[in-house]
Every structure is written in C-alpha cells, then in structure tokens.
C-alpha cells in the first residue's frame, strides 16, 4: 500500500512536471497576438525582397502562415503585389475562371526604410491549429486599378531550411477574377506638316473687280470742252482746254459702222508729271484713259506721243492704241497753241482719237494764263473760203446794183 501511494505520487508529480513544461513551451510559442506590420523571419533567405510602396488607394492583401520548426515559430509574410499598368486605361477586375497561387517569402524588413509599411492582416495561432493545417485564405475584393507609370520588381526568395525541419509554406490563394479592360479612344497624333482629319471647306471666290465699261453712241454728238491742268509744285506745268472724242470700229473696213464716246470733263481726272524736256498729261475716266506726251525741242514744243484705252461694257471689249513719233500741235516755247477745228489721229485699226476747240500750253508759263496764240493751219483753211464766199457775194451784189442803175438811165434818155 505505501508503495502504491508512492508510485501514484511519483506519477502525479511526473504529470505535473510534464504539464508545467508543456504550458511553458506553449506560452513561449504563443505569447500573444502580434502586430505583423513589421514581421521578422528566422529563415536564412538569400534574396531580400525590396519593400514596395503601394498606391494609396489600394488595400494590401496578405496572408500569414505559421511555420513550426523544433518548437520555434517563424512567421512569413506572403504579399500580393499588384503591378500597375503603364498604359492610360481603366481596368476593372472581376473574378477569373482559373486560380493563381503565389508563394512568396518576405524576409525581415529593416527599420531604416523611409516609407511606411501598410498594415498587415493579423492571424492568431492557437493550440487548436493542427501542425500541418493551412492558414485561412484571404480573398482580395474587386477593385479598379488607376493609371500609374511606376514599375515594381518582385524578388521571390526561397528560404533554405535544415533537413531536419518541416516547412509549412505560406500559401496565398487569389480568388479567380476576370479582367475587363475598357480603353478610351486614342487621340490622333498630328505630325508637323500633316493633316490628320479631312476638312470639307467650301470657299467662295470673290468676284474679280471689273472696271465698269463705257457706253458708246451710234451717232456723233457735240463734244464738251474741259479744262485740265498739271502742276509742278505750285507752278503750272501743263494747261489744256479741249474736247476729246474716241471713235471705235469693230472691223478695219471703211464701211464698218462707227461708235462714239465723248469724254465728260466732270467725270475725268487730270494728272501727270513735269520735266525739263518731257511732260505728260494723263486723263483718267470710267472705262479708260487718254495720255498726251509733250516734248521740248530747242525753241519749240509739240505732242510727240498719244495713247488711249477704252473698255466697252456691252459686249465687253477693250480698244487700245498708241501713236509714237508724231509732231502734233507744234508751237514756240512760251506760246499757246490753238486749233478750233477738229483734228483726228488714228491710234490703231479699231481706235481713233478726235479733238476739237483745242488751246493748250506746256513748259514755260507766265502766271497762270496762256501765252501768245499760234493757230493751226486748218483753222485758216476754213476762214479763207468763208472770206472768199463773202467777197464773191459782195461782188455779185454790186454788179447787180450797177446793172439796175444802167437800165434806169437808158430809159430816161429815150423820152427826151
């Protein structure tokens, strides 16, 4: 009986010692629930994973696994690192049909890192966890990945364990997801000097400015006389009083009908230039112009060149002509030339210029008045016949009177 009591006491003492030692080992193995925001790993890994700074809008998805090695527990962090895309698209992640399993071993993170490690998921390992049971699976929620230009390099290290240790790998099971990518339309790139889009442009060309044509008269009419002057500063250079008419013919035949255009002094502008030996008078009107060039030669001057242009509106036709090396209206320097009779000059086969009631002077002026008048010979040819006709008429009248008187005298002598 005493031996049985002593044996029972020894047995209870042994059980007490075994239970005491077991509770100490359990307390050492699981002292408390740790915050694994900075876990340490006892494994002798050769590769050190670089800490990755994740975007602020993404929550880390991590799983902790417990490794039992000779009574020591080594905690490893299995992290899922989402590599952002570098293309500007919006990606929506939904569950796919095939699971992807990553086995990552992350070694101890140093405290000298400048970035703040994101919080990790806490796992409490209790006595009820079986030695070879797998940790719970963390399934990341569906999220939307934004645009990012950074690239993350993953370094996965396989820890080398002693042969007498049993390793429980940390397994991260990512739930199947389906990736649906919606791309925004790419904007076209415009290269210099090229047009990316076709532009339908309707351009309306402005009508070309046309000079209103002149209206021709089928029959000649009285020509108005205008006064035209050209000044050299304040001094008078050219002064002309005359009427001008332009005559056009569509055909060179003498039987071709003529049409007439008279210059209106009120609608004509005079301009020109003055020189020591050459001066010109330019008369501009609606639908054309007339240009007269004066040349001074020793003690006389004359018109050496005549040009004209006329545009007809109905039908639209341009008549122009030029006469060079002519001597017209020649007179002495300081005198004015006067020609009342009509003078004609053929400028081209279809254009003729006619002047009437002309009195003009160029170069030397005294005050603003014409000098001594030199008349054209054509004026004399008109006056002489008139004078002759008058003389002849007077002679006829005298002879008639004389005959009448003779008859009267002869009749008186017969009565006596």
Curated annotation (Swiss-Prot):
Encoding gene (name): LAMP3
Biased composition (Polar residues): 142-170
Biased composition (Low complexity): 188-208
Assembly with partners or alone: Monomer. Interacts with FURIN.
PANTHER family: LYSOSOME-ASSOCIATED MEMBRANE GLYCOPROTEIN, LYSOSOME-ASSOCIATED MEMBRANE GLYCOPROTEIN 3
Disulphide-bonded residues: 237-274, 339-376
Renumbered residue ranges of the record's region Disordered: 135-217
Biological process annotations from GO: adaptive immune response; establishment of protein localization to organelle
Residues spanning the membrane: 382-402
Membrane-topology annotation of the record: Single-pass type I membrane protein
UniProt keyword list: Adaptive immunity, Cytoplasmic vesicle, Disulfide bond, Endosome, Glycoprotein, Immunity, Lysosome, Membrane, Signal, Transmembrane, Transmembrane helix
Primary subcellular site in the record, as a coarse category: other
Official protein name in the record: Lysosome-associated membrane glycoprotein 3
Gene3D superfamilies in the record: 2.40.160.110
Lineage: Eukaryota, Metazoa, Chordata, Craniata, Vertebrata
Region forming the signal peptide: 1-27
Localization, UniProt: Cell surface; Lysosome membrane; Cytoplasmic vesicle membrane; Early endosome membrane
A Pfam family matched in the record: Lamp2-like_luminal
């Amino acid at each position: 009986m005493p031996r049985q009591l002593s044996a029972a006491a020894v047995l209870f003492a042994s059980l007490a010692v075994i239970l005491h030692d077991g509770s100490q080992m359990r307390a050492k193995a699981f002292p408390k629930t740790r915050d694994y925001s900075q876990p340490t790993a006892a494994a002798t890994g050769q590769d050190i994973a670089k800490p990755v700074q994740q975007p602020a809008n993404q929550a880390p998805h991590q799983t902790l696994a417990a490794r039992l090695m000779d009574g020591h527990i080594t905690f490893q962090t299995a992290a899922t690192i989402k590599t952002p895309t570098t293309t500007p698209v919006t990606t929506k992640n939904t569950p796919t049909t095939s699971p992807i399993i990553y086995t990552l071993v992350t070694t101890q993170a140093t405290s000298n890192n400048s970035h703040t490690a994101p919080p990790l998921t806490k796992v409490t390992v209790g006595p009820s966890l079986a030695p070879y049971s797998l940790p719970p699976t963390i399934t990341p929620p569906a999220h939307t990945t934004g645009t990012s230009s950074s690239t993350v390099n993953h370094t996965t290290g396989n820890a080398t364990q002693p042969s007498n240790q049993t390793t429980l790998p940390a397994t991260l099971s990512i739930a199947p997801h389906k990736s649906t990518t919606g791309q925004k339309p790419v904007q076209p790139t415009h290269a210099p000097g090229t047009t990316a889009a076709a532009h339908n442009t309707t351009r309306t060309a402005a009508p070309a400015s046309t000079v209103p044509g002149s209206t021709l008269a089928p029959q000649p009419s009285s020509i108005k006389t205008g006064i035209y002057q050209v000044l050299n500063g304040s001094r008078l250079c050219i002064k002309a009083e005359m009427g001008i008419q332009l005559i056009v013919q569509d055909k060179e035949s003498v039987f071709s009908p003529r049409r007439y255009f008279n210059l209106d002094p009120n609608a004509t502008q005079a301009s020109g230039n003055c020189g020591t030996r050459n001066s010109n008078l330019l008369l501009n009107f609606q639908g054309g112009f007339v240009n007269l060039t004066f040349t001074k030669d020793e003690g006389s001057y004359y018109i050496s060149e005549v040009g004209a242009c006329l545009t007809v509106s109905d039908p639209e036709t341009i008549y122009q002509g030029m006469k060079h090396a002519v001597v017209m209206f020649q007179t002495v320097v300081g005198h004015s030339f006067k020609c009342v009779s009509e003078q004609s000059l053929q400028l081209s086969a279809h254009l003729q210029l006619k002047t009437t009631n002309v009195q003009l002077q160029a170069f030397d002026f005294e005050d603003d008045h014409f000098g001594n008048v030199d008349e054209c010979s054509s004026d004399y040819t008109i006056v002489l016949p008139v004078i002759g006709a008058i003389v002849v008429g007077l002679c006829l009248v005298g002879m008639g009177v004389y005959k009448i008187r003779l008859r009267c005298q002869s009749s008186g002598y017969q009565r006596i």
